[in-house]
């Protein structure tokens, strides 16, 4: 499963996921920050469980990742998902920097894109579905607030299927950062970078690919060539669930201004902004968020199946 030998006291893989990895079945990793910090209870737990079922219906195996009682878990029970949902912001949000300390302290932790990639790679999982990646925050030229997700994408061999970077971020600077570190930004059936709640943005992806098999082939070639690092697959939200650009941009601008006024910074900024945007849009952005996660899970399942077929 993985070249690195890690103690089972630190990393536990559920029987369903273990069986899939052993028998070379397609597996799709899922993060847990979206459960604890991305949505309110009970929609968060319900969505997480439904996303897992969606992946199973596509013929792949879901592997929701989190830290439970100081153990990195790959594949959660429904009870563990509901625990993260109920505890919400009381659960520690864990990125690369925080991971060893939360594990060492025996705490519960919700994994971001970065730490989910790390744990997925330890387990030997190559495909990961999420809502949106982190990126360069607005005003980063003054604050240097840049998500650790981007460096993880530069270094860790996992493909991340998302609806682009979260639209609360500076999308232009995020694309420039990814380019600098050689991270492919693939537009699935699009040349325009999706902007999370919206299908397009003023920015281009680095390449358009129109099928899961093309994406899987690129993964195989990239990693077999010794080109370490992840790939971003930007999958536009389905048209019927996309939000009007002027509506979402007005809500984001107001939320960003409020965050600055209240001094909300660092890893608390994204949960604050997403929650405030949901309030300002009367819950419409939350509905869109849920639907884009389902859409990404379906595409990730197809990519995982194609990758497994090619890589064996």
Curated annotation (Swiss-Prot):
Changing residue 166 to A: 2900-fold decrease in reaction rate while no change in substrate affinity. GO terms for biological process: nucleobase catabolic process. Coiled coil: none annotated. Substrate binds at residues 93, 113, 147-149. Mn(2+) binds at residue 145. HAMAP family: PsiMP_glycosidase (MF_01876). This is Pseudouridine-5'-phosphate glycosidase. It comes from Escherichia coli (strain K12). The gene is psuG.
């Amino acid at each position: 499963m993985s070249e690195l030998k890690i103690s089972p006291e630190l990393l536990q893989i559920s029987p369903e996921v273990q069986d899939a990895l052993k028998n070379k079945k397609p597996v799709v990793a899922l993060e847990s920050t979206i459960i604890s910090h991305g949505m309110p209870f009970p929609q968060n737990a319900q969505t997480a469980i439904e996303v897992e079922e969606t992946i199973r219906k596509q013929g792949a195996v879901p592997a929701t990742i989190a830290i439970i009682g100081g153990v990195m878990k790959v594949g959660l029970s429904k009870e563990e998902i509901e625990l993260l949902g109920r505890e919400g912001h009381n659960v520690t949000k864990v990125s690369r920097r925080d991971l060893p300390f939360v594990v060492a302290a025996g705490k519960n932790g919700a994994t971001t894109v970065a730490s989910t990639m790390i744990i997925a790679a330890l387990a030997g999982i190559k495909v990961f579905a999420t809502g949106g990646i982190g990126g360069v925050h607005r005003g980063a030229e003054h604050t240097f607030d840049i998500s650790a997700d981007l460096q993880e994408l530069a270094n860790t061999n996992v493909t991340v299927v998302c609806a682009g970077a979260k639209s609360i971020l500076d999308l232009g600077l995020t694309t420039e950062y990814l380019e600098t570190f050689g991270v492919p930004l693939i537009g699935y059936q699009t040349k325009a970078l999706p902007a999370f709640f919206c299908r397009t943005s003023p920015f281009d992806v680095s390449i358009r690919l129109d099928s899961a098999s093309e994406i899987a082939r690129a993964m195989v070639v990239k990693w077999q060539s010794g080109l370490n690092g992840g790939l971003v697959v930007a999958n536009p939200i389905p048209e019927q669930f996309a939000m009007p650009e002027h509506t979402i941009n007005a809500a984001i601008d107001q939320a960003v201004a409020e965050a600055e006024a209240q001094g909300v910074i660092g890893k608390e900024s994204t949960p604050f902004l997403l929650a405030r945007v949901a309030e300002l849009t009367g819950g419409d952005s939350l509905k869109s968020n849920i639907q884009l996660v389902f859409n990404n899970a379906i595409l990730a399942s197809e990519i995982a199946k194609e990758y497994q077929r090619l890589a064996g």
